Regions:
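Bacterial Sec-dependent N-terminal signal peptides
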Residues: 1-21
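Enriched - but not universal
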Residues: 14, 35-38, 164, 181-183
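Acidic, contiguous N-terminal accessory segments
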Residues: 17-123, 138-148
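Feature activates predominantly on carbohydrate-active enzymes
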Residues: 59-68, 72, 99-240
Length: 240
């Protein structure tokens, strides 16, 4: 009986170890937003000096920016940034009058004590933090940054060829992301993940359905479903 118990507990232990291993596997779901702490302690400490305190600009995207910076800095730098209003912040966002930046452009500059991120309009503050996070994520030094980004195209959209029945014309990677049968009552959290990923690379529009459109999409009940998705995307500067 002792031998049987030993074999039993050995199997359970092995199975538990396998489950733990599976639970920590990188599935790729987060794509490039899978924030993991780097190994270069010197660059990490330098980044922490900037990232410990952040001053937001007071834009309509402040809450989204706050959540993204908290998520990134906790994972990459193992700190929880403080959000302040004063000049002591190591990362400072503020509105500027440089109209050449357009409605979605931004600047990132760094000095010895702070990184400044000016933009002329709200969307610039949504887009600006992502490349800054990416530099930290890739272990790049944050000294003497002088980045100026202005989108070359006004409309940068993803064109889905999704049918209302969940199929995708010429689709080879599963069913449609949109769960029309659940909307608008249930809004899947994946829609927010999708929008966040798009915003991180400057996508500002999405076409939900196939170009060979099912006319039901224009019915009142389906427009309510579309509106539920639009409410999620709007928070991240994405239009349907």
């Amino acid at each position: 009986s002792c031998i049987i118990l030993f074999i039993f507990y050995s199997c359970i232990s092995h199975l538990y170890g396998q489950v733990q291993a599976v639970s920590t596997v990188d599935t790729g779901y987060e794509l490039w937003l899978n924030y993991k702490s780097g190994s270069n302690s010197r660059l990490k400490q330098a980044a922490i000096r900037y990232a410990s305190q952040v001053r937001l600009a007071g834009s309509q995207y402040d809450e989204v920016i706050r959540e993204e910076l908290e998520r990134a800095f906790k994972a990459l730098l193992e700190i929880t940034p403080g959000f302040v209003r004063g000049e002591e912040a190591g990362i400072q966002m503020s509105f500027c009058t440089d109209k050449r930046l357009g409605k979605e452009g931004y600047i990132i500059r760094s000095g010895k004590k702070r990184i400044t991120l000016p933009a002329s309009y709200d969307a610039g503050f949504l887009y600006g933090p992502f490349p800054l996070i990416r530099l930290i994520q890739c272990g790049e030094p944050l000294v003497q940054l002088n980045i100026r980004e202005i989108p070359a195209l006004e409309f940068r959209q993803l064109n889905h060829w999704d049918d209302l029945n969940g199929n995708i014309e010429r689709g080879y990677a599963g069913k449609s992301l949109w769960k029309w049968e659940e909307l608008p009552e249930k809004v899947d959290s994946r829609y927010t993940d999708y929008a966040r990923t798009n915003a991180s690379i400057g996508i500002n529009g999405v076409m939900l359905n196939n170009v060979n459109a099912d006319p039901r999409i224009l019915r009142r009940d389906f427009l309510k479903k579309v509106a539920a998705l639009a409410d999620v995307f709007r928070i991240l500067h994405i239009r349907v």
